[in-house]
Amino acid sequence: MRWLNLLFLIFCHGLLSAQCVSVSGFVKDAVSGEALPGATVRTMKNATIGLTTDGNGKFLWTANQSDSLRVSFVGYEDAVVVIGLACEIEVKLTPSFTGLDEIIISSERLIAEEFTMSKIKKLEIYTNPSAKADPLLAVNALPSATTTDESANISLRGGSPNETGIFLNNVPINDAVRYGQLNGIGTFSIFNTALISQVQVYPGNPPLEFGNTASGLIALTTDEMIPTKAIHTVSASLASVGYYTSRKVGKGAALTGFTNFQPSGLLRWFNPVALERIKRFNTVDLGVHFFSRLSERTALKIFTYANRESFLFDSRTPTFRGNVNQEKARSYTVTNIRHRFRNSELSFNHGLSFSRARFSQSTLDAQLDLTDFYTSLNYQYFGTKLEIKTGLSYDYRGSNFEGKFPRYRYALGEQFPVDSTASRQAIRLPELYLYGKINLTPKWIAGGGVRKGISTNEQSGFLSSQLNINFRPTKPWNFILSMGRYNKMVIPQGISAESTQIQTDQYSLDVSHTKQHLESALSLFVKDGQQGDQQTHLRGIELYGRYRIHRNLRTQLSLTSLRARQTLKGETISSPFDIRYFIRGNAEYKFGDTWTATFVFLFREGSFYLPVVGAHFNSSVGAYEPIYDRQARLPNYSLIDFSFSNLFAVGKNASAVAFCGLSNVPNFKNVRDYTYNFDYTLKTAEYYALRTIYFGVVVSF
């Protein structure tokens, strides 16, 4: 009997030892395997008790063997798990759509996907303080980004923003920025992050399945999720109030709508010094997205968007100090239809866009109307080793500019002479393309293609071509060699009345090494271009490293160096992107299960400008005309940002993320340009954004 009692005690001790004080859990997408941060975990006994997963999709639960947990996440089916004796549990949530065929046609894969360098996920856009929850600003955090003006006009690897192609669902989006000036520079993009599922970035050698792109390419894709129940999201921050909803319509369709209002009052009140020059801004936008699986193999996607914005800021020039007013209204619609055959796919893409912008500053009073029409038909074959994609496209871009403007750039006051102009220009660009990719061996992939621009009455034809090679000798290593010639027709805007062609020759070698905790990459690239009489020559190198020190701490560091020259009429000077170093990095720390703190920095060499060394008084005009010296560099640029966020449950069926960001924490005075007094004897520095605070909350239910 004593032996039985002893065995019983040993057995009970084993059971007690097997029960964990706490249980660690991991929640992920059942299809893609990706972690799901912000998923809600609650006990079945009491729905008011719960927590949310951290930024890695993990959670820690105080163990109780009898506990049953309900795990939920917006856009996914709920899952119920019993803890039992497990110390670790993995929860797979199924996306809210049904049927294997539906999953097969749920997204369109780029044929040149193996030659991409960067993919940005939705969560990365929200958690990066430099991105300000904007998809295009998130691109500026990449090592390949060489944007120097803190705007959403993206430069990649030293290319002009005019050379960068931006596509939404395979349709080019021109003028994709808000608060844009007459020169095209804009502060934010027009894209709603809540609707974007992924951003793919080609820093150079853009795939020729996309047309009219001369340098880098940014491809955005909207979500194709069909929720089983209605999804609602309400957001509020210092500069915006928004509402987003998505619901299932019929058997296999989803209808999504959103609207945002962005006033400037609160943001300016919290940041009176940093935003001293901004008098007012506001935006109202509305978007509707419809996705339908018309059949097991056919999908339809329609997205329409409209916005109205205004921007008033203080301008200071030698001959005028006063307000600059900008107003703009625009709308666009993107339609996609694709049908999947057994080993191939046929797709049709269409885009239509209209915009009207008005600018006024002293005697400048101008209106710019832009019209874009795009359509393409594509066929893609999926073989075991060979993939081929071919198609044709037609791209129309029209510009209508009229107004009055100062006759002399240095005489902007109302007392100086003005000229009036009216111009109407357009480009019509039909193109044919063919791209093929072959898996030579399990380690080698080769791709290549051509794209022919057909000549019209407005412009001559051109031929673009490229070659890509991907080599994976072992699992952690990846080598990508790319080269090609690319062409782009630039739409005329503003006073400029002639469209121009940009042609670039590019060569790049990208090497990456990825292990469990360490990612590293090296890129070497060469780019030679021509636009009109101007030639550009660029050489560059990128170094990148990303290391997870432990479960809660991740760091990233990159160095980009550019040597860029431009030649015009026999004279060679440094280009605006001749910058010897961009040093950027970040550190992300997760604590308390749901809190995340992020530290971001950027240091770069100052860009070039033309200093004024004197002035000549033009008596016929009544103003001083500046005399410029040779190029000089602005002071070096430094930026440090900090943000933190918290994921938490709200009530029984909702979750929220609260965030707060502080930009330019040390309040660096980064010089953007210089302004002068009337006779150019006194110089004053103009600065980029000073220290700025921004916070808000997003609630999903």
Put a short name on every predicted segment.
Residues K28-S32, A39-M44, S72-Y76, G84-N128, ...:
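Short, acidic, small-residue-rich periplasmic hinge/interaction motif at the N-terminus
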Residues A47-K58:
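Short, acidic Ser/Thr/Gly-rich low-complexity loop/linker segments typical of extracellular
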Residues E77, C87, L110-T164, N170-P206:
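Periplasmic N-terminal accessory/gating domains of Gram-negative outer-membrane beta-barrel systems
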Residues V91-K92, F188-K229:
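A beta-strand signature from Gram-negative outer-membrane beta-barrel systems
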Residues N349-G351, A357, R472, T500-E542, ...:
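Membrane-embedded beta-barrel scaffold of Gram-negative outer-membrane proteins
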Residues N439, F525-D528, D533-V613:
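Gram-negative outer-membrane beta-barrel transporters
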Residues E605-F617, L639, S645-F701:
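C-terminal beta-signal and adjacent terminal beta-strands/loops
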